[in-house]
């Protein structure tokens, strides 16, 4: 509580204090108009920058959605299409079939090489990965078997290839291979067991036998009884590949669409 007598006993002090207050107030500068302009300009710059960032996000999301989905067909002559026209091998037929089914934004890259062994395939992975595949269909090992290469070596190479592809963001579909029993039943069984074992251990989708429905049928293979005809490749595409591949394409396209939608939604800018 304030003592009123003490307050009245000090009029000069109060008057002096009021005088000082008036003098100080009179000496204060008016707000600088340049400072206000600078503040307005800063706010405007921040707003423009935020709008630019939002536009860039929308552009990047649109480009991602429009960028083709890349499927890499990686393997040996069975992939390359030895002995058939360029539009008859399985990668070409697969892309054409996908287009017919409405997947207009999907491209299939043929990276098959005749005579390729699992070791050779591993050695060219750096070059192959430049395609940045979203999905890779990997079929290799037949030439290793023809040469009688140790099963452990073949499996190690396939595991290396799968891991490299996965590390680079590609989902792998592994095409299983089976061989004739002229190499001995032990080798044949050990070789066939590679593919399901790798698929299970490395969490990849397996086509149990890539040539299922075609291998061993003279009507669907060329004179060498090894490489499919155009008709044989058609069966491989429609029956062996598409049932496994289509759900993966659908999932990837949905993910791209969701990413684009989220990125194109404007965020609130605080000014």
Locations of regions flagged by a protein language model:
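Short, mixed-charge, low-aromatic patches
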Residues: 38-53, 76-84, 113-118, 150-155, ...
């Amino acid at each position: 509580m304030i003592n009123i007598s003490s307050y009245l006993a000090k009029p000069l002090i109060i008057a002096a204090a009021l005088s000082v207050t008036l003098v100080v107030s009179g000496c204060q500068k008016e707000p600088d108009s340049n400072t206000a302009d600078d503040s307005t300009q800063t706010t405007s710059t921040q707003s423009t920058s935020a709008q630019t960032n939002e536009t860039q996000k929308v552009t990047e999301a649109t480009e991602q959605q429009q960028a083709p989905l890349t499927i890499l067909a990686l393997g040996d002559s069975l992939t390359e299409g030895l002995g058939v026209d360029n539009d008859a091998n399985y990668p070409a037929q697969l892309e054409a079939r996908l287009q017919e089914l409405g997947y207009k934004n999907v491209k299939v890259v043929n990276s098959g090489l005749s005579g390729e062994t699992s070791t050779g395939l591993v050695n060219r992975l750096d070059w192959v990965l430049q395609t940045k595949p979203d999905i890779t269909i990997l079929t290799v090992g037949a030439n290793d078997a023809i040469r009688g290469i140790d099963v452990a070596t073949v499996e190690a190479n396939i595991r290396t290839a799968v891991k490299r592809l996965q590390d680079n963001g590609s989902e792998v579909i592994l095409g299983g291979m089976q061989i004739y029993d002229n190499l001995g039943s032990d080798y044949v069984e050990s070789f066939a067991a590679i593919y399901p074992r790798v698929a299970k251990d490395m969490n990849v989708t397996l086509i149990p036998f890539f040539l299922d429905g075609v291998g061993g049928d003279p009507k669907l293979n060329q004179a060498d009884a090894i490489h499919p005809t155009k008709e044989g490749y058609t069966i491989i595409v429609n029956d062996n590949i598409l049932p496994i591949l289509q759900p993966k394409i659908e999932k990837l396209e949905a993910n791209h669409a969701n990413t684009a939608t989220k990125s194109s939604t404007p965020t609130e800018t605080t000014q």
